[in-house]
A protein has these predicted regions:
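Detector for the mature cores of small, proteolytically processed
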Residues: 1-77
Length: 77
């Protein structure tokens, strides 16, 4: 398995289907301290997904699997 990735979107919010494809399953919304949002796999720990060090540092909490950061117009409302 490859290392988990962190992708940032600023142009437009992803659809639910796009977000699910990116994180590989059910989506969990994590609010970041700067007001941005991070989407992660809600069941990542159950699936044994690998630690995402970069996303964990950004979120200041343990994040596994792929993460999608939403900024500006890309935020979910």
């Amino acid at each position: 398995m490859s290392d988990p990735s962190v992708i940032t979107r600023v142009d437009a919010p992803p659809t639910l289907e796009e977000a699910q494809e990116m994180v590989g399953g059910m989506v969990e919304l994590v609010m970041l301290s700067d007001g941005d949002q991070m989407l992660v796999n809600e069941e990542g720990l159950l699936y044994g997904l690998p630690l995402n060090q970069k996303a964990s540092e950004v979120a200041n909490r343990h994040i596994v699997g792929n993460a999608l950061i939403l900024r500006g117009k890309a935020k979910w409302t």
